[in-house]
């Protein structure tokens, strides 16, 4: 059963010039429970090589490994699953090609999108953007905690809050119904990636009453 407490998205260009695997190791050392590889510009061959290395690191750490958007890469590197946005491969097609055993995550910013994703076979939702964020240019207007609460009431599958989340507001995201938080710059943009991940994981763990 995947644990969504701290879901760290790896996008190399936001990592301050550090090697991708260094960012992954730091996030895992700090307690990341899931890692998503989100590289929109790398050639397929490089993505496969990188994905295989991350697969090994996440397996050793007992963390879930998700690939963003690229179904072919997710299958090639034997990732645990795929995450897609509203403009990516349609969820029913992704589910059919992935098969029943792999995890399918879908981004949702409205209750209608969330309900449809659940019907289409999503295993979890990435919900947001909760707060304003500079990490994703396609994040859209923030839905706030009220938007998150509405989506939580609309679906039964796990929800990971996305967008502008940091140690100061993460507890509120959990209180509003999220099962975990997804972050990019709050962890991989930090000077000490492991320490940043550890702090966020502690906040989420306390908020969830674990």
Curated annotation (Swiss-Prot):
4-amino-2-methyl-5-(diphosphooxymethyl)pyrimidine binds at residues 36-40, 68, 107, 136. Gene3D superfamilies: Aldolase class I. Its cofactor is Mg(2+). One of its GO terms (biological process) is thiamine diphosphate biosynthetic process. Its EC number is 2.5.1.3. 2-[(2R,5Z)-2-carboxy-4-methylthiazol-5(2H)-ylidene]ethyl phosphate binds at residues 133-135, 164, 184-185. Binds 1 Mg(2+) ion per subunit. Mg(2+) binds at residues 69, 88. Condenses 4-methyl-5-(beta-hydroxyethyl)thiazole monophosphate (THZ-P) and 2-methyl-4-amino-5-hydroxymethyl pyrimidine pyrophosphate (HMP-PP) to form thiamine monophosphate (TMP). This is Thiamine-phosphate synthase. It comes from Moorella thermoacetica (strain ATCC 39073 / JCM 9320). The gene is thiE.
């Amino acid at each position: 059963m995947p644990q969504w407490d701290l879901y760290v998205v790896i996008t190399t260009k936001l990592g301050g010039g550090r090697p991708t695997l260094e960012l992954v190791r730091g996030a895992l050392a700090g307690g990341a429970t899931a890692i998503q590889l989100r590289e929109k510009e790398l050639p397929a061959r490089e993505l496969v090589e990188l994905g295989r290395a991350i697969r090994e690191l996440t397996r050793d750490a007992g963390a879930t490994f998700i690939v963003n958007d690229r179904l072919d890469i997710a299958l090639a590197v034997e990732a645990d699953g795929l995450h897609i946005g509203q403009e990516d491969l349609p969820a029913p097609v992704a589910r059919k090609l992935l098969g029943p055993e792999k995890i399918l995550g879908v981004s949702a910013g409205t209750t209608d999108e969330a309900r449809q994703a659940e019907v289409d076979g999503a295993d979890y939702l990435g919900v947001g953007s909760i707060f304003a964020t500079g990490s994703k240019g396609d994040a859209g207007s923030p839905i706030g905690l009220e938007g998150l609460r509405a989506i939580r009431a609309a679906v039964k599958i796990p929800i990971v809050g996305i967008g502008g989340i940091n140690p100061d507001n993460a507890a509120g995201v959990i209180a509003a119904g999220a099962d975990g938080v997804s972050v990019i710059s709050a962890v991989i943009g930090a000077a000490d990636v492991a320490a940043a991940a550890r702090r966020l994981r502690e906040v989420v763990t306390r908020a969830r009453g674990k």
